[in-house]
């Protein structure tokens, strides 16, 4: 299969792949990273992020029970074990206020403010 490929074709293919790598790295670097801890309540309870950028929420669960980081408006949910950590990836959002909560303790609520 590869025997019919010429050196010129292989070089062109390699250059195309090499040209795409910086773009994927640049896109990954553009994500806004937010840290939040949980121990029966979210700290901080109000998170802020710029509009139009991917958001990475790093959640550290310090409680003795598992929790589920959930947001219906952001369309994300992730179970995080007791004393565990997880990353929740959020797609780029328009400006607005987006509520999140612990599915297992709905009194524990927070807001993501996208500006």
Please describe what each predicted stretch is.
Residues 2-13:
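Bacterial N-terminal signal peptides that target proteins for export
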Residues 11-22:
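Bacterial N-terminal signal peptides
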Residues 23-28:
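Sec/Tat signal peptide C-region and signal peptidase I cleavage site
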Residues 29-54:
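N-terminal edge beta-strand
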Residues 32-33, 80-115:
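Extracellular/periplasmic metallocenter environments
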Residues 38-45, 73-75, 83-87:
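N-terminal post-signal-peptidase region of extra-cytosolic proteins
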Residues 59-61:
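Asparagine-centered strand-capping/turn motif at beta-strand->loop junctions
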Residues 64-82, 110:
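Histidine- and aromatic-enriched segments that form or immediately flank copper-ligand environments
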């Amino acid at each position: 299969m590869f025997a019919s490929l010429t050196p010129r074709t292989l070089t062109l293919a390699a250059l195309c792949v090499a040209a795409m790598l910086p773009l994927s790295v640049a896109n990954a670097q553009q994500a806004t990273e937010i840290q939040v801890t949980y121990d029966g309540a979210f700290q901080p309870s109000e998170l802020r992020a710029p509009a139009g950028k991917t958001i990475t929420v790093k959640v550290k669960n310090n409680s003795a029970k598992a929790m589920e980081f959930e947001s219906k408006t952001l369309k994300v949910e992730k179970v995080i074990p007791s004393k565990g950590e997880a990353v929740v990836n959020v797609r780029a959002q328009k400006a607005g206020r987006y509520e999140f909560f612990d599915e297992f303790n709905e009194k524990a609520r927070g807001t993501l403010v996208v500006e």
